[in-house]
Design a protein with these regions (language model features):
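Loop-centered beta-sheet repeat module
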Residues: 171-230
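Blade-level signature of beta-propeller repeat domains, shared across WD40, Kelch, NHL, RCC1
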Residues: 327-333, 338, 345-364
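Beta-rich, blade/repeat-based domains predominating
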Residues: 48-58, 101-116, 148-170, 204-221, ...
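Short glycine/acidic-enriched loop and turn motifs that connect beta-strands
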Residues: 15-19, 69-74, 123-126, 181-183, ...
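A short beta-strand motif characteristic of beta-propeller blades
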Residues: 40-46, 93-98, 143, 149-155, ...
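Short loop/turn segments immediately following beta-strands, especially the blade-tip
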Residues: 31-37, 83-90, 129-139, 187-195, ...
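Blade-loop segments of beta-propeller domains
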Residues: 40-114
């Protein structure tokens, strides 16, 4: 049983306002789960502007953060920062920074096997990988791929908008969701500083806007969250060929909802029994049951996030809590997750955090 007093939570935030968000934060915020199970604030730590999305390497005590802007002078665009964290106190120290190879990097993913990170640059529509050393500092060998294309939504899909990257379970392939191109593009990986080789594309319904992606724990099924249509494409994953095949498209919002449509994040429970996604506008978490035979989804219900504009959310390391980051309410609301039904219920714990965007747990 994990000692709950040694669980850290890092929160990525907006520190500079953008057209879609009014920033209130100063950097990356750290919390520690106390003996009573409640999160207590440690401090905030400086980073690049808008350290929104994070990823962590628990074994090497490393944290990487996007700098989601387009005007860092030394880079001519966005950036990414590398931090070490103290395993005893959770304190962060920024040790390096690097150009993201584009504008508005909105997602970072760690590739531990190759000691490199991958970035999705939303505004410029590109993917970049950057290798790093054991100390977290970046080394030579960055590789950039520029996406080309558009789709039917003239306001949001006038060009490519890479939104996330995800490694497949074998670590052989990288899946890049591009909201502007209506596709999840699959790349094969080659070495720590080698190229990304385009292998296949999953093309979703026009105007869907793929945003985030998650694999089922069995590695055979995958889930593409579409921001603009508020749908999920359930896919079969062929790990030999590196291909995705959609077998179901399901709505995330109630049929009678006529308000804003904008999904944000998706996660499959470690048990594989349930999948969850966040809905901005509706300000909710959608709860699905996962069919044990084919991975398809059945709607179980919706749970209000008790705040405005839920972005990323995180399942606790034990899988018995869900933490929802309400960007425009400056709160993280904690829900109990029923291990028999998958349903959520508010615990009453509300963590104050300015403009929270991304949540990452670290066990020590």
């Amino acid at each position: 049983m994990t000692d709950p007093s040694r669980t850290f939570l890092y929160v990525g935030t907006y520190t500079v306002s953008l057209p879609h968000v009014q920033a209130t934060a100063q950097g990356i915020y750290a919390f520690e789960r106390a003996a009573d199970g409640l999160m207590q604030a440690i401090d905030w730590y400086p980073s690049l502007p808008n350290p929104t999305f994070l990823d962590v390497h628990s074994e090497h005590n490393l944290l990487f953060a996007c700098g989601e802007v387009d005007d860092i002078e030394e880079f001519g665009g966005g950036g990414v920062s590398a931090h070490t964290f103290d395993p005893e106190t959770g304190a962060l120290t920024m040790v390096d920074r690097h150009a993201s190879g584009g504008e508005w990097p909105c997602h970072v993913r760690l590739d531990e096997a190759r000691s490199r990170i991958s970035l999705a640059n939303y505004k410029s529509g590109s993917i970049q990988t950057i290798p790093y050393g054991d100390d977290g500092r970046f080394v030579e060998g960055a590789f950039n791929v520029q996406h080309e294309g558009s789709s039917v939504n003239q306001e949001r899909q006038e060009g490519p908008h890479a939104h996330s990257t995800t490694l497949d379970p074998s670590g052989t392939f990288l899946i890049a969701c591009d909201l502007g191109m209506d596709m999840a593009r699959v790349y094969e990986l080659d070495g720590a500083d080698g190229p990304l080789t385009h292998r296949s594309d999953l093309v979703v319904r026009p105007g869907s806007g793929p945003r985030h992606f998650d694999f089922h724990p069995n590695g055979r099924w995958a889930y593409v969250l579409n921001e603009l249509s508020a749908t999920i494409d359930v896919c079969n994953w062929n790990g030999d060929a590196g291909t995705l095949t959609s077998i179901q498209t399901i709505n995330t919002l109630p049929d009678d909802w006529d308000g804003p449509v904008s999904t944000a994040d998706i996660h499959v429970h470690p048990s594989g029994k349930w999948a969850y996604n966040s809905n901005r506008g509706h300000d909710s978490i959608t709860i699905f049951a996962v069919d044990a035979n084919d991975g398809t989804l059945t709607l179980l219900g919706h749970e209000s996030t008790r705040g405005k504009t839920p972005r990323n959310f995180a399942l606790s390391p034990e899988g018995d809590r869900l933490y929802a980051a309400n960007q425009d309410s400056d709160t993280i609301v904690v829900f109990a997750l029923d291990q028999e039904t998958g349903l959520l219920s508010a615990t009453g714990e509300i963590i104050d955090a300015p403009t929270p965007v991304c949540l990452k747990f670290v066990l020590r």
